[in-house]
A protein has these predicted regions:
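Basic, amphipathic alpha-helical bundle interface domains used for macromolecular binding and assembly
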Residues: 35-46, 61, 68-78, 285, ...
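P-loop NTPase nucleotide-binding/switch module
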Residues: 171-206, 210, 238-290
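The Walker A (P-loop) glycine that initiates the GxxxxGKT/S ATP-binding motif of P-loop NTPases
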Residues: 218, 280, 302
Length: 498
């Protein structure tokens, strides 16, 4: 009678809780019993593992085998436990030394031939293994991804026989050395390519400098989508911690976390997207668009065309920076600290306010169109701007305004001031931080309170207005928020919603 224990990792949301594979062998009729709340794919591991061991010229024990995946109440799916199960059986049958598995974690799916295949969600498991101080054995196809967790000892393998030879000391495998991830020089469209629209460019600069939410409104063809596509080029690079969080999310949904390293995500879902597609969901909760836009930009074009119920689910993550998906068996929290940029037309036909008088929408149609956007949702958007039509110029003169590089430098300076002062962008300041870093002179405080009363702004809107004023002061490299900062910030608030 013998017992072996091997460590592995499950995948729950973007977390990787530890799973202990316990293998017990006893005399009796040859059988293999798998317990510990395994899903169908894990139950199928029994046949894959048996074939992989036999086809690797190793001995499959003809004994009664009991496999337990602990903790039993943790859901487990996929083929990620195949390698750990195989090594547990080999250790229990004394074909590999069990002591060599004490400080090792294993991930990998086995082919019938014994080859070790790639699995998804390796980066969260690598970060957890580094924290636990263990070595991680992964398929070679996942090794570069696992090395994103700097300081982690990674063993890359192609076949089950390689692992057995390594653990027995016959052919030791050197820790995998990453080739080094190059910072991809992704070309962004230049801000100078947008003709005119100086006010909109100014709003874009403020939004980038303080991570503020932004809503463009205007007739079709005025450059709203064009302007929004320029925002990613203005944002500062991700920090190492932020880049790891983004890559971990992409690893979970199999979006090749190394292909966009380390750029900020830019997500643009279609207006027909459902609620689960936007915020996440499913019987086994998966990340939605707001999580895929974590530390990046979520652009919602044609905002009123989205279903109202879909838009309303954005309220909580816009405030908290995360979303909780609850199901009968699971309750999973996903990160969702994104910057919302939206665009919309002023009416169903899009031409309200045009001098040509093309709009034929009735007041009832316009009201019904705008009612799709609730007051609480619009209240959470810091910058509201109407993008007017510019004079048509098919061959415009050379733009004299700042290009993307110059604007990005201003944004970087402002963000650096914010990080030194409070450790986050202005848009993410909580109430204590707002009171500490957005103080006003008594006369300016009274002026702002009076203005908010006249414009019937909510307290939340007033707080967001203060954050925008703080960003304007940072762009001017001044510590004190002046009256003209408040006046400009007030221009970006709608006097009345709907």
């Amino acid at each position: 009678m013998s017992l072996a224990i091997v460590h592995s990792r499950a995948q729950i949301g973007v977390e990787a809780p530890v799973v202990t594979v316990e293998v017990h062998m006893a005399n009796g009729l040859p059988s293999l019993t798998l317990v510990g709340l395994p899903e169908t794919a894990v139950k199928e591991s029994k046949d894959r593992v048996r074939s992989a061991i036999l086809n690797s010229a190793l001995q499959y024990p003809a004994r009664r085998i009991t496999l337990n995946l602990a903790p039993a109440d943790l859901p487990k799916d996929g083929g990620r436990f195949d390698l750990a199960i195989a090594l547990g059986i080999l250790a229990a049958s004394m074909q590999v030394p069990a002591l060599m598995l004490d400080d090792v974690e294993c991930l990998g799916e086995l082919a019938l031939s014994g080859e070790v295949r790639a699995v998804k969600g390796v980066l969260p498991a690598a970060l957890a293994a580094r924290k636990a101080g263990r070595t991680l054995i992964v398929p070679r196809a996942n090794a570069e991804e696992a090395c994103l967790a700097s300081g982690l000892k990674v063993i890359a393998v192609d076949h089950l026989l390689q692992v057995v030879a390594h653990l027995n000391g016959h052919v030791p495998i050197e820790p995998y050395k990453s080739d080094g991830l190059l910072y991809l020089n992704k070309p962004y469209p230049d801000l100078n390519e947008v003709q005119g629209q100086l006010a909109a460019k100014r709003a874009l600069l403020i939004a980038a400098a303080g991570a503020h939410n932004l809503l463009f409104s205007g007739p079709p063809g005025t450059g709203k989508t064009l302007l929004a596509s320029r925002l990613p080029g203005l944002l500062p690079p991700l920090s190492e911690q932020e880049a790891l969080e983004v890559a971990a999310i992409q690893s979970v949904v199999s979006l090749a976390p190394l292909s966009h390293w380390p750029h900020r995500p830019f997500r643009q879902p279609h207006h027909s997207a459902s609620g689960p597609a936007l915020v996440g969901g499913g019987s086994k909760p998966q990340p939605g668009e707001i999580t895929l836009a974590h530390h990046g930009v979520l652009f919602l074009d044609e905002l009123p065309e989205f279903d109202r119920k879909v838009l309303e689910v954005l309220r909580e993550p816009l405030e908290s920076g995360h979303i909780v998906i609850s199901r009968a068996r699971d309750r999973v929290s996903f990160p969702a600290r994104f910057q919302l940029v939206a665009a919309m037309n002023p009416c169903p036909c899009g031409y309200m306010g045009e001098p040509s008088g093309r709009c034929r929408c009735t007041p009832e149609q316009i009201q019904r169109y705008r009612n799709k956007l609730s007051g609480p949702l619009l209240d959470r958007i810091d910058l509201h701007l109407t993008v007017a039509r510019e004079a048509t110029a098919l061959s415009p003169a050379q733009q004299t305004g700042d290009n993307t590089a110059k604007t990005a430098a201003l944004v970087a300076d402002a963000r650096e001031r914010q990080q030194r002062r409070q450790g986050c962008a202005n848009a993410f300041l909580d109430l204590p931080g707002l009171r500490e870093y957005c103080t006003l002179a008594k006369v300016d405080e009274g002026w702002l309170e009076s203005a908010c009363e006249r414009l019937t702004l909510s307290l939340r809107a007033a707080h967001r207005l203060l954050k925008v004023a703080r960003t304007l002061a940072d762009l001017e490299q001044t510590e004190a928020i002046a009256r003209h900062h408040l006046q400009e910030a007030l221009q970006y608030r709608p006097a009345a919603i709907n």
